[in-house]
Amino acid sequence: MPLTVKCPICKTPVEWAPQSEFKPFCSERCKLIDLGDWASEKHAIPVKSEFDLDALDEFDLDEDAFFKE
C-alpha cells in the first residue's frame, strides 16, 4: 500500500510514489504557488545569528568615539 500525503498547498491527497511527478504537491500549479511563496519570502528558514549582538557592547562598538579617528 503506497503512502499518501496531503498536498501542502491545497491539502489534496497525493500518492507518494515514483510516478507522482509533483510530489509532495498534487499538481504543477501547487508546486509553483509554493515556489512563489519562497521567492517572495513568505516562507523562511529560521537562522541563528553568527554574532551575539549583546556581546558587541562588550567591545564598545556602539560608542561614537570608536568610529572617530
UniProtKB/Swiss-Prot annotation:
The keyword Metal-binding applies. The keyword Metal-binding applies. Zn(2+) binds at C7, C10, C26, C30. Binds 1 zinc ion. Inhibits all the catalytic activities of DNA gyrase by preventing its interaction with DNA. Acts by binding directly to the C-terminal domain of GyrB, which probably disrupts DNA binding by the gyrase. Its cofactor is Zn(2+). Gene3D superfamilies: Erythroid Transcription Factor GATA-1, subunit A. It holds the Pfam family YacG. Interacts with GyrB. This is DNA gyrase inhibitor YacG. It comes from the Bacteria. Belongs to the DNA gyrase inhibitor YacG family. GO terms for molecular function: DNA topoisomerase type II (double strand cut, ATP-hydrolyzing) inhibitor activity; zinc ion binding. Keywords: Metal-binding, Zinc. GO terms for biological process: regulation of DNA-templated transcription. It comes from Shewanella putrefaciens (strain CN-32 / ATCC BAA-453). The gene is yacG. Disulfide bonds: none annotated.
